[in-house]
UniProtKB/Swiss-Prot annotation:
Pfam families registered for this protein in UniProt: RuvX
EC annotation from Swiss-Prot or TrEMBL: 3.1.-.-
Protein name, UniProt field: Putative pre-16S rRNA nuclease
Molecular function terms, GO-annotated: nuclease activity
Any one of the GO BP annotations: rRNA 5'-end processing
Enzyme class: hydrolase
Domain of life: Bacteria
Organism of provenance: Clostridium perfringens (strain 13 / Type A)
Keywords in alphabetical order: Cytoplasm, Hydrolase, Nuclease, Ribosome biogenesis
Length: 137
């Protein structure tokens, strides 16, 4: 059972996938956003490649727990994905995952250019790993 993690932003979508046992998350790629149709096609291609049964999308919430414009954008894209996807889609509170990803990359002494290229993929990995840790308990 593979699970896909998504960090959906306005310009890119970070993608991570679980190992077959659902224990660990690995970053896969960063999709450059285009339009809903092409975004969905790109996500579905990865789902088919890895045999994904569940998608976990990071839900950006405000610090007070409300959902703002970014959260609405995530919900809208997931509604489009749902039309093509046979599995289930779940949301995961992604507050501070990008901050954690930046911190980890700074500690690894990655250049600014390298950080910019992989931050969304790393954030997707954090989102998915958090979800995997929760369901394994």
């Amino acid at each position: 059972m593979r699970i896909l993690g998504l960090d959906i932003g306005s310009k890119t979508i970070g993608v991570a996938v679980s190992d077959p046992l659902g224990w660990t998350a690995q970053g896969v790629t960063t999709i450059k956003r285009d339009c809903y149709t092409k975004d969905v096609e790109a996500v579905m291609k990865i789902c088919k490649e890895y045999g994904v049964e569940t998608i976990v999308a990071g839900m950006p919430k405000n610090m007070n727990g409300t959902i703002g414009p970014s959260g609405e954008m995530v919900k809208n894209l997931c509604e489009q994905i749902e039309k093509s996807f046979d599995g289930k889609i779940e949301f995961w509170d992604e507050r501070l995952t990008t901050v954690a990803a930046h911190r980890a990359m700074l500690e690894a002494d990655l250049s600014r250019a390298k950080r910019k290229k992989i931050v969304d993929k790393i954030a997707a990995t954090y989102i998915l790993q958090g979800y995997l840790d929760r369901i394994s308990k």
